Design a protein with these regions (language model features):
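Activation segment signature within eukaryotic-like protein kinase domains
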Residues: 125-126
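Glycine-rich ATP phosphate-binding loop
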Residues: 33-38, 43-53
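Catalytic-loop of the protein kinase fold
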Residues: 137-154
Length: 360
């Protein structure tokens, strides 16, 4: 076994742990290390998630034990990453899990562009996610960190499997405010909205909110805002005008109606998973097809003209300004037209919305 410091790999390539040979280091972070391993008998590939025992009495250690326990209760579901076994020693716990060779949903959306404009595929995989989260909730488990990085892709993007239960809880209500990822957690999870000081926030509606952001990711490749907070100007603009996303992104009216039900500020009135499943099942178009085609054409022309002054930066990477402009007074919003996405300022409108990026 190699170094045992937090920022160095604990396994050298070629190390064998039980009957698994380490063949690649996949990631190293403060939360743990992930390796690719091969069974020396069957040649089957697995991922090994290694968690350091920092302090047996610490909150961190409790989260580790909780992750294994809750994930194990869900492991048999076809859309949950399977736990094969758990290997423990005095300093580390190694969770051997199913390996997804196609990577995560973030990569599929951002790098491989699998879903953009593909209505049937978006519907197919998002229904899988709803059904999987519904299964988790039926078992009394709430993920609290739903995001594309925690969803693995199989079958060339047609099958999704939920992973990483490190922040999951069995509590229907939680006072762990700020638990999750800023792009994806709900307003009430931040402790800034509708706080019940006795109970905390409801964890099931918080998961539903995260699913809504993922649905925007799948449909547009963008995040709707940096954080659902009054400090975020884009989110504040959405609170003032619930049709903002329809006017600024190439989403369909059908999707807009669903999104408004998901992003209901009151978690008790937020759409349920059962209703969400039915609405998505009957949603024909997630984006406005003609406008998407025109948008792609404009992006192509922008790339070809990237040396011109107006396209001084390649629009392959539509930048989000450091400070999002006050959208309320932006002249590019046509309050009277649901199709105001198109026309002058199209690229600038899309650029107002945060690019998808991984949170460390």
């Amino acid at each position: 076994m190699g170094s045992d410091t937090l920022d160095q790999p604990i396994f050298a390539i070629g190390t064998i742990i039980e009957d698994l040979e380490i063949i690649q280091t996949l990631s190293i972070s403060i939360n743990g290390q992930v390796y690719l391993a091969k069974d020396i008998n069957t040649f089957q590939l697995y991922a090994i998630k290694s968690l350091r025992h920092i302090d047996s009495a610490s909150l961190h250690q409790n989260f580790q034990l909780n992750e294994i326990l809750l994930h194990s209760r869900l492991s048999g579901h076809p859309h949950v990453i399977r736990i094969e076994r758990v290997i423990q020693n005095s300093d580390w716990t190694h969770i051997v899990i199913e390996y997804g060779s196609e990577g995560d949903l973030f990569t599929a959306i951002v790098d491989n562009n699998i879903y953009y404009g593909n209505h049937s595929l978006i519907r197919h995989v998002f229904l899988q996610l709803i059904e999987t989260v519904r299964f988790c909730h039926s078992k009394g488990i709430y993920h609290r960190d739903l995001k594309p990085e925690n969803i693995l892709v199989f079958d060339r993007g047609h099958t999704l499997k939920l992973a990483d239960f490190g922040l999951a809880t069995a509590d229907c209500y939680s006072k762990d405010y700020g638990c999750g990822s800023t792009f994806y957690f709900s307003p009430e999870c931040q402790g800034g909205f509708l706080i019940d000081s006795q109970m905390g926030y409801a964890t099931a509606p918080n998961d539903v909110w995260s699913l809504g952001v993922i649905l925007i990711n799948l449909s547009t490749g963008r995040n709707p805002w940096h954080i659902a907070s009054l400090e975020d100007k884009t989110y504040c603009a959405f609170l003032r005008d619930p049709d903002l996303l329809l006017k600024m992104l190439p989403i369909s009216s059908e999707l807009n109606r669903i999104i408004k039900r998901i992003f209901c500020l009151d978690p008790l009135k937020r759409i349920t998973l059962d209703e969400l499943y039915l609405r998505v099942q009957h949603c024909i178009h997630f984006t406005r097809t003609e406008e998407v085609t025109q948008y792609e054409s404009m992006v192509l022309k922008a790339v070809q003209l990237k040396n011109a002054q107006v396209y001084s930066k390649s629009t392959d990477d539509l930048p989000t300004p450091p400070d999002t402009p006050d959208i309320t007074y932006s002249p590019c919003i046509n309050q009277g037209s649901s199709s105001s996405f198109m026309g002058t300022g199209l690229l600038q409108k899309v650029a107002l919305f945060p690019k998808m990026e991984k949170e460390i």
